[in-house]
């Protein structure tokens, strides 16, 4: 019986699952928005939120813990320099999962995972069209 086990296996071995979640976490921290399947998005949220909470306190020990989980120096720098201060006053709930319908090939439920309060990127094509 598997009572009390909240982890989704996602039809992968533990090594594959951990590597996939690490890659997805790096992508989310880099781009601040990614598209994936709904079960993966829900698991990703469980991994990313504690990382951002860790970044709110920029100690050497926390940076080493973050590097141990991310394995990417650039993402650790971004996490502690940008994301930690951005969410300093927010007590959790750093990610948003938006359902996006179903994938064409296999009808898998898709979702958009994004960091809340991310800066809006201005669309230069819309500004150019307005100018004309």
Swiss-Prot record:
User: One MF term in GO for this entry?
Assistant: structural constituent of ribosome
Instruction: List, alphabetically, the Pfam families matched.
Output: Ribosomal_L17
Write the signal peptide boundaries. none
Please provide the Gene Ontology terms (biological process) for this protein.
translation
Q: InterPro entries from the xrefs?
A: Ribosomal_bL17 (IPR000456), Ribosomal_bL17_CS (IPR047859), Ribosomal_bL17_sf (IPR036373)
Keyword flag Ribosomal protein: yes
Q: Name one GO cellular component term.
A: cytosolic large ribosomal subunit
Q: Name the keywords, alphabetized.
A: Ribonucleoprotein, Ribosomal protein
What PROSITE patterns does this protein map onto?
RIBOSOMAL_L17 (PS01167)
The record's annotation in Gene3D superfamilies points to: Ribosomal protein L17 (3.90.1030.10)
Q: Which domain of life is it from?
A: Bacteria
Instruction: Say if the entry is tagged with keyword Transport.
Output: no
The entry assigns this protein to a family as follows:
Belongs to the bacterial ribosomal protein bL17 family.
HAMAP family this protein is in? Ribosomal_bL17
Q: Could you describe the subunit structure of this protein?
A: Part of the 50S ribosomal subunit. Contacts protein L32.
The name this protein carries in UniProt is Large ribosomal subunit protein bL17
Provenance organism: Polaromonas sp. (strain JS666 / ATCC BAA-500)
Taxonomy of the source species: Bacteria, Pseudomonadati, Pseudomonadota, Betaproteobacteria, Burkholderiales
């Amino acid at each position: 019986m598997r009572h009390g086990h909240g982890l989704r296996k996602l039809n992968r071995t533990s090594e594959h699952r951990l590597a996939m979640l690490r890659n997805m976490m790096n992508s989310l921290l880099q781009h601040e928005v990614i598209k994936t399947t709904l079960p993966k998005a829900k698991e990703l949220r469980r991994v990313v939120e504690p990382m951002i909470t860790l970044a709110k306190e920029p100690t050497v020990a926390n940076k080493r813990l973050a590097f141990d989980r991310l394995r990417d120096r650039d993402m650790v720098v971004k996490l502690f320099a940008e994301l930690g201060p951005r969410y300093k006053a927010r007590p959790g709930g750093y990610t948003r999962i938006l359902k996006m319908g179903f994938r064409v090939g296999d009808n898998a439920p898709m979702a958009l995972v994004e960091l809340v309060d991310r800066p809006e990127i201005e669309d230069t094509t819309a500004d150019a069209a307005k100018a004309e």
